[in-house]
Amino acid sequence: VHGDIYKNEPLAFLIEDSQIKEQIEPYFMARIVDVKEFLQHFPFVGTADAFHFIIEDPVAPWNNGIFALTWDEQGQVRVLNEPIGKPVRLNIQTLTCLMMNYRRASYLARIERLETDEETLKSLERIIPNMEAYFSDYF
């Protein structure tokens, strides 16, 4: 039997004889074209103490720099271009992986693709929805 499934599908666990061959091949690519606009519309879960991303993007210079996130009394995020709160240093590729939940903040920090303090790392884990990124192009 040959088939395609998405990342983290527990197929091997569900089959009684779980000796199967699994092969992971990247299929879709994602890119955040406008960091500020993306962050302003992102569905954060709750709020956090203010922090700021320090982004490097070699292709889109408007994405380079500081993007601070603060939340108002109604829980609406505001994105400002000034260093408010603790820093989170990463490149655009890592930011995309993080925000699309391809990889969690703690993993990205562990492999040194994201730099921040422990408290801000916990905030990122909490406010970024923990859902599978899934794009189906079969329709």
Which ranges hold each PLM region?
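Intrinsically disordered, low-complexity, positively biased terminal segments
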Residues: 1-139
